[in-house]
Every structure is written in structure tokens, then in C-alpha cells.
Amino acid sequence: MSQLMIDAQQVCKNYGRLEVLKGIDLQVPKGTVTCLIGPSGSGKSTMLRCVNHLEKVNAGRLYVDGDLIGYRERDGVLYEISEKDAAKQRSDIGMVFQNFNLFPHRTVIENIIEAPIHVKKQPESKARARAMELLEQVGLAHKADAYPVQLSGGQQQRVAIARAVAMEPKLMLFDEPTSALDPELVGEVLRVMKQLADDGMTMLVVTHEMGFAHEVADQVVFMADGVVVEAGTPEQVLDNPKEQRTKDFLSSLL
């Protein structure tokens, strides 16, 4: 059984002639947190979206928990799997976007129980009980019957995290989860993410929050221009980077 939750091997992605990912190798062990950092346009979010086949890779292989994502291999040839099979793979991978993506016409608890009931076929009573547990964990049990428009951005993002966790994923992907928030609301979301990490959730996080990366990440990967420039522990990459490109990026944040 693989000890790697994510194993990306020479992953390439292009849009026409534009190469966005140029042979990415990335390994994320189970139960660890990896933060992807780098300038805008470096390919971080594209890489994240390839992990659950929201973007299709053009070359290379990407495995999650030992399963080839998006394709089936036969006699050395890759065949794209059906959207139904891709959705099944995706149901084991939680994803939290920048902009919350909550259903505006459903209450907080309705947002959380929707997928467990319809995708995982859970009884509504079980889904509701679990949703309330998760809302308690993210500090929003008192908002169960509120609508998204009645919540702050930070509260909406905490609901979005609870909604993703309700599907009992083996992996969580975060695409700049705090970038759309007012600065004073960032901390409440990062605290929820840190709690997830402390609970052993495997996480791949695209972020500009260097303090979070330093405190929570097991591995930091610096990307630029579609390649991995440098990877290692937070101390190695953030405190003592070897590559000039990494040093330039980090100094630009100060």
C-alpha cells in the first residue's frame, strides 16, 4: 500500500502553445501538509486542479492513494476514464476554492448535507448529525439555519471547509482559501485549517500565507514558470532558500 497520497510524475499541462506545467514531480506523503507557493502564473492552481482532474494533464502521470487520476492504463496506453468514474475519484478529494462556492439559496446546514446525501447516499439524519458536529468544530453551529449572504467571508469559507470535510475525503485541496478575505478574517480560516492538519488530514495548499506555511506545512514547494524550483521543509525553503529565484520571491513579500 502506497505511503504517498499524491505522486505526480512529470506532469505537463498546456493550453494550446502555452505551457503551464512543464514536467512537475511532486510527492505528498499521507498525513502531511504541503504548501505550494510562488508568483501568480507559476502553475500552482493548475497543478492543484490536475490532482482531481478538473484540469486534464497532457503528459505524465498523477496518482492519488495509488490510483491513476483521470485515466486508465492498458498495454502502456492511457485512456481517459468516463466523467462518472472521474466524479467517483473526485468524491474522495475535498476542494476549497478562493470564493467559497456555497449554494446561495440553501442554508448553511443544507449546503453541508447536500453531497453526503446525494453522492455518498447517507441517511439524512446521519448527514445532519455530522454536519452539526463539523459546524461545532468550525465555530458556526449557531449559524446552521443562516443563508450564505448572512455570513462574513470568513464564516462562508469555514462553512466551505466543513462542507468538504463532510464528504470524508482522504485528501483536501485548498486553492488560496484566504485570498478573497478581508485581512482581519484570515486568521479564523487558518485556525480551522491548522486543526485539520493537527487531526492528520493530508492537505495540498496553494497559499500566500507564509506564516501558515512555516507553522503548519511539512513540505513547502516553490513553483515559478511551470516548474518546481525548490522543495523542502519550511526551514529549508522559507528560511534558507538555495535558489536565487526563491530568494527573490520571498524578499518581494517583505
Curated annotation (Swiss-Prot):
Gene3D superfamilies: P-loop containing nucleotide triphosphate hydrolases. InterPro entries: AAA+_ATPase, ABC_ATPase_HisP-typ, ABC_transporter-like_ATP-bd, ABC_transporter-like_CS, MetN_ABC_transporter-like, P-loop_NTPase. It is a peripheral membrane protein. ATP binds at residues 38-45. It holds the Pfam family ABC_tran. CDD domains: ABC_HisP_GlnQ (cd03262). GO terms for molecular function: ABC-type amino acid transporter activity; ATP binding; ATP hydrolysis activity. The complex is probably composed of two ATP-binding proteins (ArgV), two transmembrane proteins (ArgU) and a solute-binding protein (ArgT). Belongs to the ABC transporter superfamily. This is Arginine transport ATP-binding protein ArgV. It comes from Corynebacterium glutamicum (strain ATCC 13032 / DSM 20300 / JCM 1318 / BCRC 11384 / CCUG 27702 / LMG 3730 / NBRC 12168 / NCIMB 10025 / NRRL B-2784 / 534).
